[in-house]
Each structure stands twice: as C-alpha cells, then as structure tokens.
Amino acid sequence: MEAENHTTVAELIILGLTEDPKLCIVFFVIFLGVYIVTLVGNISIITLIRISSQLHTPMYLFLSHLAFVDILYSTSVSVIMHMELLGHGLALPVAACAAQLCITVSFGSAECFLLAAMAYDRYVAICSPLLYSTLMSPRVCFLLLGMSYVGGCMNGWTFTGCLLSLSFCGPNQIDHFFCDFSPLLKLSCSDVSIIGIIPSISSGSIIVVTVFVIAVSYIYILITILNMRSTEGRHKAFSTCTSHLTAVTLYYGTITFIYVMPKSNYSTEQNKVLSVFYTVVIPMLNPLIYSLRNRDVKEALRKATVRVYS
C-alpha cells in the first residue's frame, strides 16, 4: 500500500559537471575539442592498421578494436555531456538512461577484456615466438575478440537489468554528467541491498580476471626478458610492451579507484573528475600512447604519408 502513495518518476535530470553558466561554456569547448581529437586519433589508428600490410598482425588487430571500442565508449558519454553543458542540465527518460548505462558499461568492460587479450598476445610473442602463428591464429584472435564483446555486453545487461528493476519515486536529479549506476542507486525508492551488490560483483569479477591475466602475462614476459643475453633484444621486447602497460595502468588505476575503493574515501566532485578521466580523457590518450611510443605505427604512418604526398 505504501508504494501506491509514491509518484513514479518518468524521467531523470542529469545535473552535469557544473551549474555555473560560464563554466558550462568553457567545459563545452574543452570537451568538444577532446572528443574531436578522440575521434580523429582512433579513426586514424583504425585506418592506418587497415591500409598498412605490416600492421596486419594479431597485436594490431586488437589495437584496432580497442580504438573502435574507445570511439563508442567515449561517444556514449560525450554526447550526453555536451547536451547537458549546452542546456545546463538534461532530462532523460528512465529507459534512455538505462540504454546509455548499458552502452557505457558494455564498451568499458569490453576494453578490459581487450587489454587482457593484448597482454596475452605480448606473452605469446615474447615467451613462445616459435608457436606464435599457432597460438595466435586467426581463429584464436576472433575467439578472443568475440569473448571481449560478449563479456562486455553481459556486464552491460547486468547493470541495465538491475537498473530497470528499481523504482524511482522521489528525487530525480542525478548529481553526475552521465547515467552512472551509483548515483542512480541513491535515487531509488526500492530495496537496493541486493541489487546494489550484483553489478559490483559482476564488474569486480571482470577486473580480477583480466588483471590476473595481465599480471601473469607480464610476470612471464619479465622473466623471459631478464633471461635474454642480448641488450638489443631486451630493449626491443620492452618497447613492444611499454605502450600497453601505460594504457593498462591509466585505465585500471582509475576504474579500480572508482569501483573498488569505498565511496566514503572521496567526494562526488572527485568522482566526477575521475569519471571524466576514464570515460573521456583515456580514449583520447590511447591513440597517442600507441602511436608516439610504437616504432611500427610510426613507420607505417610515415609510409602512408609518403604515399599520400608522392
């Protein structure tokens, strides 16, 4: 009977990064620039890998899919962010908010799986080079890619299913710049004791499994590199891993802080800053990390530039 006294909320209002009109304009210009760089950088990586035969290897196949995921991941958040900055807030139906959450979580989770697949690829290339063509055959590569997307979608649907099972009948203002699960949970008038735990278990499992794969891969890589007699061989092996390690450290460091650390350890504003970093900034940085610190990509870019202007 108590539920009948509540009015069901039809739409949710995303407050955004700030309510200051002047800051909204500044942030809009900054993040529009970041988004354009993200699109140009990741599309360039995908195009370069497609047109450069020397990059037709499993490592760069995974990198092209990482760039594709980064485009969709960033877009799912950036479009809503720009709309709310222009309108000083944004009203979305609950279903639209659930769809945005599903897309963001799906591609964010797929990125975790892709980073783990890339670590395994580096492990095979450095520790078992003679078996590389067998262990990283096209069939294995597409299986790893399929698992990445399916695993990401399953986590996305877990979050979405939990969100759609909640009732919203009180305050409807989300103190965030996109439909993230934790702020939505605070607005619900349902019992969230179990619903609130399920997404944490799902995301936590993905983080633990993928970090385990990455850590074990790099432990074996480090042992193999330290046993190499050639200094040049060590340097070459290290250089193929530094870009990936940088991307892993940035991404996992941020999402672990947000989703694993107790919420009492940081404020809502700090949560927004960290969320901006892993949803908007990191997708922009990944192409720069993999192009500026990768000899093969730089060489392929040089050849492509020569072909264009010759």
From Swiss-Prot:
Does Ribonucleoprotein show up as a keyword for this record? no
Where, per UniProt, does this protein localize?
Answer: Cell membrane
- The reply on keyword Membrane is yes
Q: How does it sit in the membrane?
A: Multi-pass membrane protein
Q: Where are the transmembrane segments?
A: 26-46, 55-75, 100-120, 134-154, 197-217, 238-258, 272-292
Disulfide connectivity?
C97-C189
What the entry lists under PANTHER family is as follows: OLFACTORY RECEPTOR
The free-text function statement in the UniProt record for this protein reads:
Potential odorant receptor.
Listed name of the protein: Olfactory receptor 5P53
Q: Which organism is it from?
A: Mus musculus (Mouse)
Lineage summary: Eukaryota, Metazoa, Chordata, Craniata, Vertebrata
